[in-house]
Amino acid sequence: MKIVVVSSPKDQPNETVEVIRMFDAGLEYFHIRKPRLSKKQLTEYINLFPEKYRKRLVIHSYHGLASTLSLGGIHLSRKHRKRGRFYRLKLFLRRKIERDLVVTRTFHKLTDITNEKRKYSYTFLSPVFDSITHSTLSGGFSKRALLIMIPQAKQPVYAMGGVDADRIPEIADLGFEGAVLLGSVWNSEEAPHIVFKKALAAAKEL
């Protein structure tokens, strides 16, 4: 069971310090989703991380920075996936050259998981449970549907939405290969790296 963490879209006190502590504790990938940051601001944010952790950073915007800053990967949003043939060709060639480049995306429909023909390093399915970040966003899938569809996925699927340490065993039972932490990390009264450690410990007990 893999555990990844997504950044808060808003500013968080000592966010990079907390993420570095997570890396030290065993975090494999940290997804940087900062839609409000300019390219310059995002670059400055990334530069707060030691170089030894750059390959564990996956960015959701300004994908060119993945090459210039030697980052781990890119996450393709709906906007990126809707771009034309030239963009897809450029991405295909880039993956041929940068063979270790992590490429991910998010699914919001179960049918898309089995119909997707493109190859990704891993994918997110959201929202699996009631969101911690957005109180009005409820889990979108029945347990029965997940048990049927997740095993049919052609690539690794990680559960996102309402995920915390207590959910890890259930996520594994549903067939997911990983879990995505967001609200449980950044909205907790505990330090974010402590929340991550608890989830990682739960995953190791499976």
Model features per residue range: what roles?
Residues 5, 74-88, 122-137, 168-205:
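Glycine-rich phosphate-binding active-site loops on the catalytic face of alpha/beta enzymes
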Residues 107, 142-145, 154-165, 171, ...:
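Glycine-rich adenosine-cofactor-binding loop
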Residues 25, 69, 118-119, 152, ...:
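Structural motif
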Residues 19-20, 46, 63, 113, ...:
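Generic hydrophobic/aromatic pocket-lining and core-packing "Φ" positions
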Residues 1-13, 203:
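Boundary/entry segment of secreted carbohydrate-active catalytic domains
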Residues 6-9, 18, 28-41, 50-115, ...:
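Catalytic beta/alpha-barrel core
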Residues 44, 137-146:
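Charged helix-capping and loop-helix junction motifs
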